[in-house]
Regions:
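Conserved GNAT acetyl-CoA-binding A-motif
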Residues: 77-91
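Active-site loops and adjacent core secondary-structure elements that bind or stabilize anionic groups
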Residues: 8
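Single conserved hydrophobic/aromatic residue that forms the stacking wall/gate
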Residues: 1-5
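Conserved catalytic-core motifs of GNAT/GCN5-like acyltransferases
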Residues: 86-88, 100, 105-126
Length: 139
């Protein structure tokens, strides 16, 4: 990756130019607990909306609460400046339940997002991602 982020971040978004675009327009946070455990990029969307563009946890630390802790850090640090925290993800049985457990609810869908914006098919749990599902939670 051009920014030296390593494989952790790329695991969550295989299209490197998309990651670079997020980084050019956003702010990156790293959760370091005796080594990097989780990374997240947020951007100022519009109309008091803060958006998580990508969040990635080192595989051996997944399921240990690091991503949830990073989301709560963002909520606590931005609630005075924004009213909504938003995230877009593929319609996946892995990610949607995670965000719902973190207090997000489904907001809207962008049809064919992964088809139109990625140069190759993206699969998660054996399912090809097609639409972008947006979820939101109040700050």
């Amino acid at each position: 990756m051009s920014r030296g982020l390593g494989d952790v971040y790329k695991r969550q978004d295989e299209q490197e130019d998309m990651v670079d675009r997020y980084l050019d327009n956003g702010k990156m946070y790293v959760l370091d607990d005796n080594g990097v455990k989780c990374e997240c990029v947020i951007t100022d969307k519009e109309n008091d909306i803060l958006e998580i563009k990508n969040i990635a946890t080192v595989p051996e630390y997944q399921g240990k609460g690091y991503a949830r802790a990073l989301i709560e850090f963002i909520v606590n640090n931005y609630r005075e400046q924004y009213t909504i925290l938003q995230v877009g993800t593929g319609d996946s049985p892995l990610t949607i339940p995670f965000y719902e457990k973190c207090g997000f609810v489904r907001s809207h869908i962008i049809s064919n997002f992964f088809i139109d914006n990625y140069d190759h098919p993206i699969y998660e749990s054996g399912i090809q991602l097609v639409d972008m599902v947006y979820l939101q939670r109040p700050l």
